[in-house]
Swiss-Prot record:
This is Beta-barrel assembly-enhancing protease. Functions both as a chaperone and a metalloprotease. Maintains the integrity of the outer membrane by promoting either the assembly or the elimination of outer membrane proteins, depending on their folding state. Promotes disulfide rearrangement of LptD during its biogenesis, and proteolytic degradation of LptD and BamA when their proper assembly is compromised. May facilitate membrane attachment of LoiP under unfavorable conditions. Residues 1-27 form the signal peptide. It is an enzyme of class 3 (hydrolase).
């Protein structure tokens, strides 16, 4: 269903905490490493961190090339929350995002927000390797590294982090300008910041590998993935960009391997969802270049049952992307017959149906899906099928419930706006579009749309009161965000 909702936005958010920062030689034993703790209270409270996180997430949605794919969003959040459930010192909710970027990277910022680059799927051979990157970033959050870095910098140069945060925002709109501003801001205190981030990386590695192991993943995946990064730097004509600016020393790899070797060996099979997510990411994203190669699909076809299914799904996906709908349907059919409730297969079947103007077939299949009431992906698929099939009222009925339960999902608001427009409900269309603008940090535009919606309904009506109350909420949000807009 997501084929109709793809967005190709511009700019990239600078990594506040990256997986490839410089790290010093580590001690031989985990027991000798100091625990730096999680205190950062004198600079930022948890509430302030969450507020800043809310602000930056909205900027991210509005300017970065987010992959707003319901299936992939569901997968990385499910995987991320599995890891979070085995982490200590969790003080904020966690949210995981995927950016369409061919460079290997991941970063964490205020309020439990973790961003992954799509290239991680290309370079992760198995789910444990992907999870190792996420566990590392989760540890940056639980240890409050960014807040503690701000606190440390406030002691030596109080204005430095104000400029740095402003530069991060500039980078969202203009990466080169943002990086230049950030470099200039930190020039006078670079050595102190490097030392601090070295400690952060050391702690995130140590805690991350523990989270990885407790979550049931292979702890050897962390040193294995780090070794892949080093191999690229050694042998590739174009090593990962992250290693050009943040070299990864042998000592970090040696320490990660030493820690993994101290843990109980584990044989961990990647989930089927991992292979399906990898096929989908490589086949539909990565800056428009299809990286779902025949070699990879042939390799999977010779692998275990999960890989074989992913290979067949990948071939169906390739055919659908090439508008070869009959071939896609024929390839997908055995998978769907074996697992009629599988959301990955149902989503692709819906795209095939809609591509052939067979919305009614998609509707009938989705209405009978076992997990329809509990799976947001299937709900969005059905709403979209109703919309494409000329039944906007049915779509609106689903989407009003969906947006009530999933207020931060712009897909729901976008589809609801389309449904209300088709029903000629102008005020409700404007209100839905306003929510999409608000999620993207465009609060002025959101307020303007809600004001227009309010003017179109009966004076003094309950609906007008609702619109006006929402306007007041957004104005209060603007006031809370003012300190960050002035950076």
């Amino acid at each position: 269903m997501f084929r109709q909702l793809k967005k190709n936005l511009v700019a990239t958010l600078i990594a506040a905490m990256t997986i490839g920062q410089v790290a010093p030689a580590f001690a031989d034993s985990a027991d000798t490493l100091p625990d730096m703790g999680t205190s950062a209270g004198s600079t930022l409270s948890i509430g302030q961190e969450m507020q800043m996180g809310d602000y930056y997430v909205r900027q991210l949605r509005g300017s970065a090339p987010l992959i707003n794919d319901p299936l992939l969003t569901q997968y990385i959040n499910s995987l991320g929350m599995r890891l979070v459930s085995h982490a200590n010192s969790v003080k904020t909710p966690f949210h995981f995002f995927l950016i369409n970027n061919d460079e290997i990277n991941a970063f964490a910022f205020f309020g439990g927000n973790v961003v992954l680059h799509s290239a991680l799927f290309r370079y992760s051979d198995n789910e444990s390797q992907l999870a190792s990157v996420m566990a590392h970033e989760i540890s940056h959050v639980t240890q409050r590294h960014l807040a503690r870095a701000m606190e440390d910098q406030q002691r030596s140069a109080p204005l430095t982090w104000v400029g740095a945060l402003g530069s991060i925002l500039l980078a969202m709109a203009s990466p080169q300008a943002g990086m230049a501003a950030l470099t200039g801001t930190l020039a006078g205190t670079r050595q102190g910041m490097i030392s601090f981030t070295q400690q952060n990386e050391q702690e995130a590695d140590r805690i991350g590998i523990q989270v990885l192991q407790r979550s049931g993943f292979d702890p050897q995946a962390m040193p294995t993935f780090l070794e892949k990064l080093l191999d690229q730097a050694r042998y590739s004509s174009r090593p990962p960009e992250i290693l050009l600016t943040h070299p990864l020393p042998e000592s970090r790899l040696a320490d990660a391997r030493n820690r993994a070797n101290q843990m109980r060996p584990m044989v961990v099979q990647s989930s089927e969802d991992f292979y399906l997510a990898k096929a989908r990411t490589l086949g539909m994203y990565n800056s428009g270049r299809n990286q779902l190669t025949s070699d990879l699909l042939d390799e999977w076809a010779k692998g275990n049952v999960r890989q074989q299914r992913a290979a067949q799904y990948g071939r169906a996906l390739q055919a659908m992307e090439a508008n070869k709908y009959d071939e896609a349907r024929k390839t997908l059919q055995p998978l769907l017959a074996a697992e009629p409730g599988n959301a990955w297969y149902l989503d692709l079947a819906t795209d095939i149906d809609l591509g052939q103007n067979k919305a009614n077939e998609a509707i009938n299949r989705l209405k009978n899906a076992r997990d329809l009431r509990t799976n947001p992906v299937l709900q969005l698929n059905l709403a979209n099928a109703y919309l494409q099939g000329g039944q906007p009222q049915e779509a609106a009925n689903i989407l009003n419930r969906y947006t009530f339960n999933n207020k931060d999902d712009s897909n729901g608001w976008d589809l609801l706006a389309q449904a209300e427009a088709a029903l000629n409900n102008r005020d409700q269309e404007l209100a839905a579009r306003a929510e999409g603008y608000a999620l993207a940090g465009r609060l002025d535009q959101a307020i303007s749309l809600l004001s227009s919606a309010s003017s179109q309904v009966k004076l003094g009506s309950l609906q007008q009161a609702r619109y006006d109350a929402r306007i007041d909420q957004l104005r209060q949000l603007q006031e809370r965000f003012k300190p960050y807009t002035k950076m």
